[in-house]
Structures are given as structure tokens and as C-alpha cells.
Swiss-Prot record:
Gene Ontology molecular function: any one: sodium:proton antiporter activity
InterPro entries named among the record's database cross-references: Na/H_antiporter_dom_sf (IPR023171), NhaA (IPR004670)
Pfam family, one: Na_H_antiport_1
Native organism taxonomy: Bacteria, Pseudomonadati, Pseudomonadota, Gammaproteobacteria, Pseudomonadales
Protein name, entry field: Na(+)/H(+) antiporter NhaA
Main localization, broad class: membrane
Compartment(s) of residence: Cell inner membrane
GO CC list: plasma membrane
Taxonomic superkingdom: Bacteria
Stated family: Belongs to the NhaA Na(+)/H(+) (TC 2.A.33) antiporter family.
């Protein structure tokens, strides 16, 4: 009962967050295509400086959101992954097989489609990872519109798949989207990680020391050339889940505290800051460029083929079973919903094509918004139709 109650609360929060993300993205599109566009762009380009002694970090507001606030989002992802691995849906190998296979297919096929369409354009190939991402809040938000017509097992399947997908995105960012490395900063970051691990081993359960060293780690990683958001994941993996004296779990306490701030503050703010695509000069021909086409087709078709195809193979070979109470039509609908890349795709896109420094910076958003929109609409329609059929057969 506690597990179901926890999942219900989590699902409700993710669903509400998904709807808020949609509103934030629509608002950004409206403002950036109105007479107030100067205010929108001027606000995001506002320089913000943080200085302590000789240490100075100067970035426009947009990068403080993408590098700073999103580190808290990745901290939350890291906490969720650690909890799921130690005592949740990822704790038993048998529970990982189906969503794990689906997640792998959902990353490989979109990347291959994007590569195929852009193989003759080396600068554009830097965006290969953009369509590999799934926005868990947005996808669960759409699925929530179907209510009890969708079995809980299918919602758990989507949630677990998305968590594994997020873990894959973390690995991709660490390996493929890091800049020129600073040896000194990496050494200092290593010292911070060593201190965090030592505190974990010594049984330190107070969150304060972890957060202070985590902030220092973020600065070191930011200066090192590795993307700063990875500091959040590293910090999460060092926060203890269990305690020796039956005290409240530090990991669960931090996860509980962060969740509403990330879901209803950071992610909508990120969507508002990054989804404001200017439609000036955009024509139907713009969507035929291989970058937006590769992203949109990768999200809509690549995710569907990859997730559904690997799920079908896993079930037909007998290494996994369909989620209890679900039919193949519902699985197909969920596979299509996995093509809602949105915030995660926008984030990877900001790394692949930096705003203001790449000719593809606007094109990637065209592909992300188009692919995500069609994935949401078609995925909802397919899942709804399959759920009606399932309920009819059951009655």
C-alpha cells in the first residue's frame, strides 16, 4: 500500500508538471513572436555575475538556468535512480529487462535515423543525441489524461523506462558533450567527490555538509569543461539512502523536498527559457532541412520503432512479459509517447548547438517541438483507442 500510495503521488505530481510545461512552452512561443520579443530575449541575455574573492562566474541568465538550476534537476534524477536501483523498480533484474530493452531501443533507433539524414553534414551530426531523450513529466502528463483506463503497470513501465532513458542521457552528456578539460579543476572536483564518499562511508546523515561540498563540486565541474549538471548526479549518488540508527532517510528527505521545486519551478522555467522559437521566416520548407527533420522523425518514428520493437522482441523471446493488464495497442501508444523529448531534448540541443553560436540552434527547437507535439497527440489517440478496446473486452 505505501508503494502504491507513493507512486500515485509521484504520478500525480509528474502529470501536473507536464501540463505546466506545456503552458510554459506555449507562453514562450507567444511572447517571442509578439511585440514583446525584445523583452523575452533581453531578459535571457541579461548578464548575471557571482563573485567570491578571486572566483568569478559571469554568464547570461539563460546559461544560469541551463547550467545552474538544471543541476538541481539532475540531482533529483540521480536521487530517483539511486533509490530505484537500491529498493525500487530497478532493484530486481527481472524488473529491469523490459523497460531496459525498450529504453535502449528508444535511444539507438532515433540516433541512427538522425545520423542517416545528416550523415553528409559533419557540423549537424553533433545533434545526434537530441532525439534520444524522453521527457518523463510531459509523457506521464499526457498518459494521466486517460486516468484509470490505463493500468498502473503500464504507467510504471513508462516511468521506469524514462528513468533508464535519463540515465542514458547522463552518460551521453558526460562522454560526448564536454568541452576542453581543465586538469586543476578536475583534480579539485575529484577531491570533492572523495570527501562526499568519505562522509557517506562514515555515516554522516545531515544534508548540510553534502550540499555545501556539492556546491563546491558544481563550481569545480563548471570550470573543468565537463558539463556542470553532472555535479548534481554525482552528489545524488553520494547521499545515503539508509541510516544506521533508523533515522529518516536523507536521500528520501532531499528527494521529497526537491520534487515540487523542480517539477513546478525549475522545469517550467527551463521550458519557458528554451522553447521560445521565433517563427519569423519559418516556412514549410524550413521543416524539410535535415536537422529539424532528423530530430522530429527520430522522436516520432525512431522512438516508436525502438521502444515498441525491443519490447516486442523481449516478450516474444520469453525474457520478459507484457505489463500486467496491458495490451499491445497500449504498449504502442506508450512507445509513441516516449517520442515526447521536450525538456530533455531541448537541454541536449542547447549543448549540441549553443544558442547564438550555431546556425542550427533554432532548427533543433523546430524539430523538438514538432516531433514532441505529434508524439503527444498520436500517442494519446492510440493509447486511448487501445484502452477502450481493452475495457470493452474486459467487460
Amino acid at each position: 500500500m505505501p508503494l502504491r500510495s507513493t507512486f500515485t503521488r509521484f504520478f500525480a505530481m509528474e502529470a501536473a508538471s507536464g501540463l505546466l510545461l506545456i503552458a510554459a512552452a506555449i507562453l514562450a512561443l507567444i511572447i517571442n513572436n509578439s511585440p514583446l520579443s525584445w523583452l523575452y530575449n533581453g531578459l535571457l541575455e541579461t548578464p548575471v555575475v557571482a563573485q567570491v574573492g578571486a572566483l568569478k562566474i559571469a554568464k547570461p541568465l539563460l546559461l544560469w538556468i541551463n547550467d545552474g538550476l538544471m543541476a538541481l534537476f539532475f540531482l533529483l534524477i540521480g536521487l530517483e535512480v539511486k533509490r530505484e536501483v537500491l529498493e525500487g523498480q530497478l532493484a530486481k533484474p527481472s524488473q529491469i529487462v523490459l523497460p531496459g530493452a525498450a529504453a535502449i531501443g528508444g535511444m539507438l533507433v532515433p540516433a541512427l535515423i538522425y545520423w542517416f539524414l545528416n550523415r553528409d553534414n559533419p557540423p549537424a551530426l553533433n545533434g545526434w543525441a537530441i532525439p534520444t531523450a524522453t521527457d518523463i513529466a510531459f509523457a506521464l502528463g499526457v498518459l494521466a489524461l486517460l486516468g484509470k483506463r490505463v493500468p498502473t503497470s503500464l504507467k510504471l513501465f513508462l516511468m521506469t523506462l524514462a528513468i533508464i532513458d535519463d540515465l542514458g542521457a547522463i552518460v551521453i552528456i558526460a562522454i560526448f558533450y564536454s568541452g576542453t578539460l581543465s586538469t586543476l579543476s578536475l583534480m579539485l572536483a575529484g577531491a570533492c567527490i572523495a570527501a562526499l564518499v568519505a562522509m557517506n562511508r562514515m555515516g554522516v546523515v545531515k544534508l548540510g555538509p553534502y550540499m555545501i561540498i556539492g556546491l563546491i563540486l558544481w563550481v569545480c565541474v563548471l570550470k573543468s569543461g565537463v558539463h556542470a549538471t553532472l555535479a548534481g548526479v554525482t552528489l545524488a549518488f553520494c547521499i545515503p539512502l539508509r541510516t544506521r540508527n533508523a533515522e529518516p532517510s536523507p536521500l528520501k528527505a532531499l528527494e521529497h523536498a526537491l520534487h515540487p521545486w523542480v517539477s513546478f519551478g525549475i522545469l517550467p522555467l527551463f521550458a519557458f527559457a528554451n522553447a521560445g522559437l521565433s517563427l519569423s521566416g519559418v516556412t514549410l520548407e524550413s521543416f524539410t532541412h535535415h536537422v529539424p527533420m532528423g530530430i522530429a522523425v527520430g522522436l516520432l518514428l525512431g522512438k516508436t520503432i525502438g521502444v515498441f520493437g525491443l519490447t516486442w522482441m523481449a516478450v516474444k523471446t520469453g525474457i520478459a512479459a507484457l505489463p500486467s493488464g496491458a495490451n499491445w495497442g497500449q504498449v504502442l501508444g506508450v512507445a509513441i509517447l516516449c517520442g515526447i523529448g521536450f525538456t530533455m531534448s531541448l537541454f541536449v540541443g542547447s549543448l549540441a548547438f549553443e544558442p547564438g553560436s550555431s546556425e542550427y540552434a533554432g532548427m533543433d527547437r523546430m524539430g523538438i517541438l514538432t516531433g514532441s507535439l505529434f508524439a503527444a497527440l498520436i500517442g494519446y489517440a492510440v493509447t486511448a483507442a487501445a484502452s477502450r478496446r481493452n475495457n470493452t473486452l474486459a467487460s
